[in-house]
C-alpha cells in the first residue's frame, strides 16, 4: 500500500468515527436502517399481486392487470373417513330467521316498504297502484315448466380421482352426494370462525391459503415457488379484527412466501379506484354493508359502521316474496347451492328501484342444473321486484331476530405480542397521571399538625383509586379514563355508554339512516358538507336499475334541514368512470401499488420474522 492510500484509509476511519459520535445521541427506530436490498430496487407493478377477499367472491390479480380474476371464495374438502357426516356452510340461510317473531317482523317490514312505495309519486305525478300477490298467484300456480333440452349442458365436478380439495367454481359444482364438506372461509366480511367442522382459526386460515394459492397458480399463472419474487397488497375491512389481520399477514409472508406486503382498508382503496379524494363510501357487499367517511386517504374512525346484511339477504327476501306470489319452481330449496345461484341470478335480472315500473309483468327464466333437463318457466311478478331491494332501507323485512345487526369501531382487546397497543398506552398514561397528581397533592399539602389527618386520609385512599382505575381499563369498548375522585362518575358514564352502544348495535339500521349516521359523526360541518356532496356506492349489492336516483332522493329527504339549505347538490355516484362497482376497491389496490409513497409502507418477510405485529404499527397507512 502506498503512502497516499494509507492516508486515505486513515481519513476514512476518522470520518467514520466522527459520524458514529454524531449518531450516538440519536433515538433509533424499531426497524434498523439497514433494510433488505429489495427495498432499493424500483418496484415493478407486474410483480405485485393485489388481493381483495370478499365473503362470496375473491378478487385477485397483478397490479398491472386491467381486471382481476373473480373466483367464488369457497372450498370443498374431501372426508377423511368413510361415513363421516356431511357439513356445508350455508349461503343464503343464516341464524335468526326461524325465531317465533321472524314472520311478524317480516310482515311489519313489508308494510313499511309498501307505505314508502305508495307515498312516493311516479315521475308523471300520479301515485303507484299497488299490486297484491294474489293477482299473480292464480296465474303462477297454473304454470308448468317446458323442457328445452333433455341435457342441461352443465355437469357436476368430476371427483373420480378423489382430490383432497376443490376450489371456486369446482367446489360450487360438487355433487351433494359426494363425500365433501363445503366451507366459505369468510362470512359477513370476517373470518368464519364457528364451533362446527373446519371452524377453528387454524382451519379457516388453511382454507384461505389453499384458495388463494390455487387462484395464483391457475389465474395468474405464477408458480408458488416464485412467490418470493412477488409482493402482495391485501385489502381489509374498515372495521377489522386485529388478530385476524395479523394471522393473514403471517400466512402471506411466512407460509405462502411473498417477499413483502402492504395492508390497507377497502374504503380508502375505493377512493383511489374512483379518483375521489373525499367521499362517504357505501360498500354494499353480498353479506355485509359498510359505511365510512374518507378524507384525503384517511378513513375517519368514528364514522365507521358495518351492517350485517347485503345482497344475499335481498335474494332470500326476493324468494320469500316470490313464494307469496306462487313461484312456479316449487322444488326450490335455500339449502341447495344450485338454487342459491339461481335466486342470485333472478334478483340481478328482475329486481329494480324504479318507481315508474308498476303493474304485473310476464317473465321467464331457465333452470340448468347439472345432470338434469333444461327447463323453461314462465311467471308473473308485480311489486315484488321493487319490494326486495327496498328491504335494504327497511331491514326488518329480512326477518332476522336476535342477531347483532350493526357494528361500530371498538377499541382493540390488545395483543400480547404488541407492547405498544392501546391497552398498554392507556394503562401507562393513566398511571403517569395518577403519579403526577399524587406528587402535586404532596407538594401542595402543608406541614401543620392539623392537616396531617387529612393528608393521611388522602394517601390511604389513593391505592383504592388507582385500583379502581386499573380494573376499568380492561374492557375494550371503554372511552373514559378515570382520574382521581372522578372514578365513580367515569365508571357510571362508561357503563351508560356501553349500554347505549349495545342498544344501538342491536338495531338494524336502514342503508339511508346508516349513511346519515356516519356523516353526522364527522368532526366538523365542513367535512359533513363534503360528505353529503359526494356519496360513493361500491360493491355488488346495490346494482339495481335506478338505485342512484332512489338513494339520492332518500338522503335528500332525510338529511338535516340546516345542511339541506347550504348543500347545492347531493351527488350519489354508483358507477365512477363507468367502472363495475364490484371492482373499484380492487382497482384502488392496484393504483396504490403504483404510488411513490407506497414505498414506505412495505413490510418485508425478514422484518416480519424479527419484529412481528409491531411492523403493522410502524408501517400501516392507517392507525393500527
Curated annotation (Swiss-Prot):
Region (Disordered) location: 1-29, 430-462
Residue numbers of N-acetylmethionine PTMs: 1
Amino acid composition bias (Basic and acidic residues), ranges on this chain: 1-25
GO molecular function, one term: ATP binding
Transmembrane segments: none
Phosphoserine PTM sites in chain numbering: 132, 412
Subcellular location: Nucleus; Chromosome
Signal peptide: none
Entry superkingdom: Eukaryota
Residues where ATP binds: 55-56, 283-286
Disulphide-bridged cysteine pairs: none
Keyword check for Phosphoprotein: yes
Pfam families documented for this protein: Actin
Subunit organization: Component of the chromatin remodeling INO80 complex; specifically part of a complex module associated with the DBINO domain of INO80. Exists as monomers and dimers, but the dimer is most probably the biologically relevant form required for stable interactions with histones that exploits the twofold symmetry of the nucleosome core.
Functional description taken from the UniProt entry: Plays an important role in the functional organization of mitotic chromosomes. Exhibits low basal ATPase activity, and unable to polymerize.
Name the UniProt record assigns to this protein: Actin-related protein 8
Organism (species): Bos taurus (Bovine)
Amino acid at each position: 500500500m502506498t503512502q497516499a492510500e494509507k492516508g486515505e484509509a486513515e481519513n476514512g476511519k476518522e470520518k467514520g468515527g466522527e459520524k458514529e459520535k454524531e449518531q450516538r445521541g440519536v433515538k433509533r427506530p424499531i426497524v434498523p436502517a439497514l433494510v433488505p436490498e429489495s427495498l432499493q430496487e424500483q418496484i415493478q407493478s407486474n410483480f405485485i399481486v393485489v388481493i381483495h377477499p370478499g365473503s362470496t367472491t375473491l378478487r385477485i390479480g397483478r397490479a398491472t392487470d386491467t381486471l382481476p380474476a373473480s373466483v367464488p371464495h369457497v372450498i370443498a374438502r374431501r372426508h377423511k373417513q368413510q361415513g363421516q357426516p356431511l357439513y356445508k356452510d350455508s349461503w343464503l340461510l343464516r341464524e335468526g330467521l326461524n325465531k317465533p317473531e321472524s314472520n311478524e317482523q317480516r310482515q311489519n317490514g313489508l308494510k313499511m316498504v309498501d307505505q314508502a312505495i305508495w307515498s312516493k309519486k311516479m315521475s308523471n305525478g300520479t301515485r303507484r297502484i299497488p299490486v297484491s300477490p294474489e293477482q299473480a298467484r292464480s296465474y303462477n300456480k297454473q304454470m308448468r315448466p317446458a323442457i328445452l333440452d333433455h341435457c342441461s349442458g352443465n355437469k357436476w365436478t368430476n371427483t373420480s380421482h378423489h382430490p383432497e380439495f376443490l376450489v371456486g367454481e369446482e367446489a360450487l359444482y360438487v355433487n351433494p352426494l359426494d363425500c365433501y364438506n363445503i366451507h366459505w372461509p369468510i362470512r359477513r366480511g370476517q373470518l368464519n370462525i364457528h364451533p362446527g367442522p373446519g371452524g377453528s382459526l387454524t382451519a379457516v386460515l388453511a382454507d384461505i391459503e389453499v384458495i388463494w394459492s390455487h387462484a395464483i397458480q391457475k389465474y395468474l399463472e405464477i408458480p408458488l415457488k416464485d412467490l418470493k419474487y412477488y409482493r402482495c397488497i391485501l385489502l381489509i375491512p374498515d372495521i377489522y379484527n386485529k388478530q385476524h389481520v395479523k394471522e393473514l399477514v403471517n400466512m402471506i409472508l411466512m407460509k405462502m412466501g411473498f417477499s413483502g406486503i402492504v395492508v390497507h382498508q377497502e374504503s380508502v382503496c375505493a377512493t383511489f379506484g374512483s379518483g375521489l379524494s373525499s367521499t362517504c363510501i357505501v360498500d354494499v357487499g353480498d353479506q355485509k354493508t359498510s359505511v365510512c367517511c374518507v378524507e384525503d386517504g384517511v378513513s375517519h374512525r368514528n364514522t365507521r359502521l358495518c351492517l350485517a346484511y347485503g345482497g344475499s339477504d335481498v335474494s332470500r327476501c326476493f324468494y320469500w316474496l316470490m313464494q307469496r306470489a306462487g313461484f312456479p319452481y316449487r322444488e326450490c330449496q335455500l339449502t341447495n347451492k344450485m338454487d342459491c345461484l339461481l335466486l342470485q341470478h333472478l334478483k340481478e335480472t328482475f329486481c329494480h328501484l324504479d318507481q315508474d315500473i308498476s303493474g304485473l309483468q310476464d317473465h321467464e327464466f331457465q333452470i340448468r342444473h347439472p345432470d338434469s333437463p333444461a327447463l323453461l318457466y314462465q311467471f308473473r311478478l308485480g311489486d315484488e321486484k321493487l319490494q326486495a331491494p327496498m328491504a335494504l332501507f327497511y331491514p326488518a323485512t329480512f326477518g332476522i331476530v336476535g342477531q347483532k345487526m350493526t357494528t361500530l369501531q371498538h377499541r382493540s382487546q390488545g395483543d400480547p405480542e404488541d407492547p405498544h397497543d392501546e391497552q398498554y398506552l392507556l394503562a401507562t398514561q393513566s398511571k403517569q397521571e395518577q403519579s403526577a397528581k399524587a406528587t402535586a397533592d404532596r407538594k401542595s399539602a402543608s406541614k401543620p399538625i392539623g392537616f396531617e389527618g387529612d393528608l393521611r386520609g388522602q394517601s390511604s385512599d389513593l391505592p383504592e383509586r388507582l385500583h379502581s382505575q386499573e380494573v376499568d381499563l380492561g374492557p375494550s369498548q371503554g372511552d373514559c379514563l378515570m382520574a382521581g375522585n372522578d372514578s365513580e362518575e367515569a365508571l357510571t358514564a362508561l357503563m351508560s355508554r356501553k349500554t347505549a352502544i349495545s342498544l344501538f348495535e342491536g338495531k338494524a339500521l336502514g342503508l339511508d339512516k346508516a349513511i346519515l349516521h356516519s356523516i353526522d359523526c364527522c368532526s366538523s360541518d365542513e367535512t359533513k358538507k363534503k360528505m353529503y356532496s359526494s356519496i360513493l356506492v361500491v360493491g355488488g349489492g346495490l346494482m339495481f336499475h335506478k338505485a342512484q336516483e332512489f338513494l339520492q332522493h332518500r338522503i335528500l329527504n332525510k338529511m338535516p334541514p340546516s345542511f339541506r339549505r347550504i348543500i347545492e347538490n347531493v351527488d350519489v355516484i354508483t358507477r365512477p368512470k363507468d367502472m363495475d362497482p364490484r371492482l373499484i376497491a380492487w382497482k384502488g389496490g392496484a393504483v396504490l401499488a403504483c404510488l411513490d409513497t407506497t414505498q414506505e409502507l412495505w413490510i418485508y418477510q425478514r422484518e416480519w420474522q424479527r419484529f412481528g405485529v409491531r411492523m403493522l404499527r410502524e408501517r400501516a397507512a392507517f392507525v393500527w
